[in-house]
UniProtKB/Swiss-Prot annotation:
It comes from Methylobacterium sp. (strain 4-46). One of its GO terms (cellular component) is cytoplasm. It catalyses: (S)-2,3,4,5-tetrahydrodipicolinate + succinyl-CoA + H2O = (S)-2-succinylamino-6-oxoheptanedioate + CoA. Pathway: Amino-acid biosynthesis; L-lysine biosynthesis via DAP pathway; LL-2,6-diaminopimelate from (S)-tetrahydrodipicolinate (succinylase route): step 1/3. Keywords: Acyltransferase, Amino-acid biosynthesis, Cytoplasm, Diaminopimelate biosynthesis, Lysine biosynthesis, Repeat, Transferase. One of its GO terms (biological process) is diaminopimelate biosynthetic process. InterPro entries: DapD_Trfase_Hexpep_rpt_fam, Hexapep, THP_succinylTrfase_dom1, THP_succinylTrfase_N_sf, Trimer_LpxA-like_sf. This is 2,3,4,5-tetrahydropyridine-2,6-dicarboxylate N-succinyltransferase. Its EC number is 2.3.1.117.
């Protein structure tokens, strides 16, 4: 079945998703399973750059991921600590893998790394004890550090570092229209959070503890410009605050969180300069 045929079948099933159950067989199940296999192998991805460098979201692939939950019953999944089991609908990406299969895949997955089937991990990536949800895409040479999470259908570019405890939001809960996208060569600081379809432009640095959602004000300190939902390429971003509105009695209101672009760097500077130096004011 061609990708166009898969998309048509999945779009039609999505419109009638209330009728899709674990008992559903035939073209709908076949199309969803084929789409998940394509995602798992990296042949397709939920979002990709179009010719004008904007990101195009392949909504049919996201819908295939969502439909897969309706098509699958809960089952025991072995491998939990102490000989216990998990109870879930989505098997591990590594289920049935042997040493040769890992060699072919070309990435490292240290003990404690969890990747759900239909996520793609590119060669050269390193997964510390972390969690990568279904439909996600992790690019070549990227490290997902300890206790970091990459949400469903999130797109992580090449040579990124997702630091310890950082969270990259998914599209499943709460349901989002578009995935989070971290472009190539980005550094996401420890315990930072990027959610609600935010795009972090190539070469950007997010300091520790920066939180970005669709409604977060992103303030360029040099110009005063405020943007939402997208960090421009090669931005260095830290946490900040904006003055709040005055209270009814005239007293100063509470300051409100924002993210602040403290500087922009070119590709050469970004490549040569240590992260700590970039974050110094």
């Amino acid at each position: 079945m061609s990708h166009a045929d898969l998309a048509r079948t999945i779009e039609a099933a999505w419109e009638d998703r209330a009728d899709v159950t674990a008992a559903t067989q035939g073209p709908v199940r076949e199309a969803v399973e084929a789409a998940l296999a394509l995602l798992d192998s990296g042949q397709v991805r939920v979002a990709e750059k179009s010719g004008n460098a904007d990101w195009q979201v392949n909504q049919w692939l996201k819908k295939a991921v969502l439909l897969s939950f309706r098509l699958t019953d809960m089952e025991l999944i072995s491998g939990a600590p102490g000989g216990a089991a998990w109870w879930d609908k989505v098997p591990s990406k590594f289920d049935g893998w042997d040493a040769e299969r890992f060699r072919q895949a070309g990435f490292r997955a240290v003990p404690g790394a969890i990747v759900r089937r239909s996520a793609f991990i590119a060669p050269g990536a390193v997964l510390m004890p972390s969690f990568v949800n279904l439909g996600a895409h992790v690019g070549e040479g990227t490290m997902v550090d300890t206790w970091a999470t990459v949400g469903s259908c999130a797109q992580i570019g090449k040579n990124c570092h997702i630091s310890g405890g950082a969270g990259i939001g998914g599209v499943l809960e709460p349901l989002q229209a578009n995935p989070v996208i971290i472009e190539d060569n980005c550094f996401i600081g420890a315990r930072a959070e990027v959610a609600e379809g935010v795009i972090v432009g190539e070469g950007s640095v997010l300091s520790m503890g920066v939180y970005l959602g669709a409604s977060t004000k992103i303030v360029d300190r040099a110009t005063g410009e405020v943007v939402y939902g997208r960090v421009p390429p090669y931005s260095v971003v830290v946490s900040g605050s904006l003055p709040g509105k005055a209270l009814p009695d005239g007293a100063p209101g509470p300051a409100l969180y924002c993210a602040v672009i403290v500087k922009r760097v070119d590709a050469g500077t970004r490549a040569k300069t240590g992260i700590n130096e970039l974050l110094r004011d």
